């Protein structure tokens, strides 16, 4: 197999043979040759119905002709300039038009950079140092947010190379647990600059907020002059034109964006209330910069993607997601398996646990060995999902009914085999 040969070569020059940890799975990942619509082709000549979709950016599917055409036209004019472009203005205006909290936008190169800037900005605006995140949430690969679950001084780095002092100001609480958050705010609220939350936890599988939970966060942050930041790197432009804040009708102070906003190219963005955003340099003194901020190729891909995402497309995505989740639940019921199917709109995951999944602690009870058997079983049948129990699956506008039917047939075969 060519993928096996490529993986051997890759392992000599790339740590672990990949450029990002989650792409690695045993015995080796397949290597991509190309993609079209909802199908991903491997160098081995295999074709897969793709529910990974590059971990979320490809809401239109692979190689949408309009996006490809727009990008090619931009590349002919240049790939980067180092001066502003009209495209940046147009994409920022499109974001502001769609996203409820967005009054100004700063482009970055990734979601990680966007959350870094958001935390710095919140600290500067409030004059406070501490931040709150949720157990199991992921906000990029920077030091302040790579922490193990813990309380106060028990918080510890989640990676070697991060000084303990760096994360002493990062507090963690369980998701969907109002009492834990209320206790934390009561004890440390005057020192907390921001609460950073994925409205749907998409990096521990796919966990929705319980009814009223996001509004609870909005209320308690307002009462305590704490900045509420929605990390919508995953949910932005996926659940609705305005993302999770439109979908759940709760408006934060700041929002971080990534993935879909770049239309398949590297891109991030920080947006929010004008009075906060005006503190970013050069308008203010909170420093944020980047050689490729507002890169014209990424901006072009993002702008064209947002143009294509209309109301009908979101209705179709919602319908497809509902159909697939209902189909999986029916399969589990027929097979007398008590696993959990979760997710809103075009997001989903199957947890191999019999208990309801409300937060990180619940998700960690899943049988990850069984999940990987499920993953490989689907892969053998031409269906590709992320190779981790703790990632989220995505549906694109390019998935059709026949793809969902084929996926459910494959899932039935695999789950039946696992039961037996």
From Swiss-Prot:
It is found in: Cytoplasm. Belongs to the class-III pyridoxal-phosphate-dependent aminotransferase family. HemL subfamily. HAMAP family: HemL_aminotrans_3. This is Glutamate-1-semialdehyde 2,1-aminomutase. Gene3D superfamilies: Aspartate Aminotransferase, domain 1, Type I PLP-dependent aspartate aminotransferase-like (Major domain). Its EC number is 5.4.3.8. PROSITE patterns: AA_TRANSFER_CLASS_3. The gene is hemL. Keywords: Cytoplasm, Isomerase, Porphyrin biosynthesis, Pyridoxal phosphate. The modification N6-(pyridoxal phosphate)lysine is found at residue 259. It comes from Methanothermobacter thermautotrophicus (strain ATCC 29096 / DSM 1053 / JCM 10044 / NBRC 100330 / Delta H). Signal peptide: none annotated. GO terms for cellular component: cytoplasm. One of its GO terms (biological process) is protoporphyrinogen IX biosynthetic process. It is an enzyme of class 5 (isomerase).
């Amino acid at each position: 197999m060519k993928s096996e040969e490529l993986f051997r070569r890759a392992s000599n020059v790339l740590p672990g043979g990949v450029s990002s940890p989650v792409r690695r799975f045993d015995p080796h990942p397949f290597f991509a040759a190309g993609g079209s619509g909802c199908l991903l082709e491997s160098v081995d000549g295999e074709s897969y119905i793709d529910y990974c979709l590059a971990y979320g950016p490809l809401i239109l599917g692979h190689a949408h002709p309009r996006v490809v055409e727009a990008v090619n036209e931009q590349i002919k004019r240049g790939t980067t300039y180092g001066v502003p472009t009209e495209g940046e203005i147009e994409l920022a205006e499109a974001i502001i038009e769609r996203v409820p909290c967005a009054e100004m936008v700063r482009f970055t190169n990734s979601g990680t950079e966007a959350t870094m800037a958001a935390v710095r900005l919140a600290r500067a605006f409030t004059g406070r140092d501490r931040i709150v995140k949720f157990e199991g949430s992921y906000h990029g690969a920077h030091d302040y947010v790579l922490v193990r679950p813990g309380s106060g001084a028990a918080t510890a780095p989640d990676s070697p190379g991060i000084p303990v002092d760096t994360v002493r100001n990062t507090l963690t609480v369980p998701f969907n647990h109002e009492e834990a958050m209320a206790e934390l705010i009561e004890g440390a609220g005057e020192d907390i600059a921001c609460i950073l939350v994925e409205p749907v936890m998409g990096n521990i599988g796919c966990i929705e907020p319980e009814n009223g939970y996001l509004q609870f966060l909005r209320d308690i942050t307002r009462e305590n002059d704490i900045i509420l930041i929605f990390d919508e790197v995953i949910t932005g432009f996926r659940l609705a034109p305005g993302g999770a804040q439109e979908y759940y009708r709760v408006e934060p102070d700041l929002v971080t964006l990534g993935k879909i906003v770049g239309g398949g190219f590297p891109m991030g963005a920080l947006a929010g209330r004008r009075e906060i955003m005006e503190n970013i340099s050069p308008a203010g003194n909170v420093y944020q910069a980047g050689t490729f901020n507002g890169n014209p190729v990424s901006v072009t891909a993002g702008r064209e993607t947002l143009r294509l995402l209309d109301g009908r497309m979101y209705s179709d995505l919602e319908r497809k997601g509902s159909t697939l989740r209902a189909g999986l639940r029916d399969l589990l019921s027929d097979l007398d398996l008590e696993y959990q199917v979760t997710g809103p709109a075009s997001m989903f995951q199957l947890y191999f646990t019999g208990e309801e999944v409300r937060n990180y602690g619940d998700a960690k009870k899943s049988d990850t060995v069984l999940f990987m058997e499920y993953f490989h079983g689907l892969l053998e049948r031409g269906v590709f999902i992320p190779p981790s129990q703790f990632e989220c699956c995505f549906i694109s506008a390019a998935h059709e009914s026949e793809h969902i039917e084929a996926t459910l047939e494959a899932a039935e075969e695999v789950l039946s085999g696992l039961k037996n």
